Amino acid sequence: EAFLEVKEYKDKGVPVVGMYCAYFPTELAMAVGAIPVGLCSFSNETVTAAERELPKSMCPLVKSSYGFAIEDKCPFFHFADLVIGETTCDGKKKMYELMAEFKPVFVMELPNSQSEKGLEFWRREVIRTKEYFEEFFHVIITDEMIHHAVHLSNEIRRSLKELCEVMKLDPAPVFGTDIQKMINGSKYRFDFKTTPELVDAVTEKILEEYHQGKHLESRPRILVTGCPIGGDTMKILEGIEENGGVVVAVENCSGVKTLDQMVDETQEDIYGAIAKRYLSTGCSIMTPNDNRIELIGRIIEEYHVDGVVEMILSGCHATGAESIYIRKFVNEEKNLPYISIDTDYSSADKGQISTRLAAFIEMIQADKSGKKELDMNYCYKLIVSGISGGKCFEEILQNVWDYTGVPVRFL
């Protein structure tokens, strides 16, 4: 339906701006009367096509995105008048260079620090992008236009944030997979004015039914963090909830992370306010990335989290390296169990992921009940599975730890 809707807007002469990243201020596109839309990047379907040109070692998100573009299998990319890139990871930067050979691409230069210098640089970049939009779309963005776009975007964010916050209830009212599907789906509603009202109605219905006693049974409450979640990587959320857990929050940039902060509409310098809001996003390309740690800490407390699952896409070196800090923070400061899942967009590892998540959730359930009955046969299976899968000794021990709760250094 979203494909048909965007075509209808194009037929009416409404421009489309495609994007791949949460750092792009969508208010700029909305201010010129364009539709900002996330481009296809979550399917294994186009990875093989991309690998004809890109290294196989690149992350699946980049390969999927590029594959959709060169195969013309993403209607949103097809109808996009302009694609907005950003200097986040190295893979994306090179992808944008290649895309520019067959599609208009504008790349925003993102600083890798959230310092005062970084903020001032980003503010100038937001204004440079605004000026480029004015030239490209032949529209002058007035103060009234940008303020209107900011207010509407804030209302959409507010409504989606409040939808996510129903998962603070214990027991959880619904499955987190359903909440995430609604969040993802909201990004493909292009009648922006009606979105807040529709989302609010869903939130109110969930709360009303909750107070009538309609909710899930008590389950281990899981926070998911790491690389972007959607499409084929929804297997992580599904694996958690199929094995007795419930995803109460998705911190990834397709979840709470992009909804947590609003643009300060009271600021006289509205472009400075836009820059501050977007630069505050905690992504592993930032150094240091204190904002992500701070947000994870708040989510753990506010959503009554029992355990943290981090999804790391193969080839995403920044998230992989930062997982060291996330594990340490969760284990040592929050005293909660943590597990990292390295994966890609294929379905080949779904069984293995399910096994690991089942053990992780079982461990949490045992801890919550005050019992710790370990199945040594299951430990043996984890070891044999690791050996047959070609894992190194430390990885195998890590899998056993994820189940037993005993740190590797003690095994």
Describe the function of each predicted region:
Residues 94, 316-322:
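Glycine/threonine-rich flexible loop motifs
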Residues 69, 287-304, 322-325:
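A short, acidic, amphipathic alpha-helical segment used as a generic capping/interface helix at domain edges
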Residues 16-70, 95-96:
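An N-terminal, globular interaction/scaffold subdomain
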Residues 11, 23, 28-42, 49-50, ...:
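Redox- and metal-dependent alpha/beta enzyme cores, enriched for Fe-S-associated oxidoreductases
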Residues 79-87, 306-314, 385:
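Acidic beta-strand-to-loop metal/phosphate-binding motif
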Residues 66-135:
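Acidic/His-rich segments in extracytoplasmic proteins that coordinate ligands and/or metal ions
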Residues 1-15, 127, 131-247, 251-259, ...:
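A charged, amphipathic alpha-helical module
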Residues 324-379, 383, 392, 403:
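Peripheral docking tails and interdomain loops at the edges
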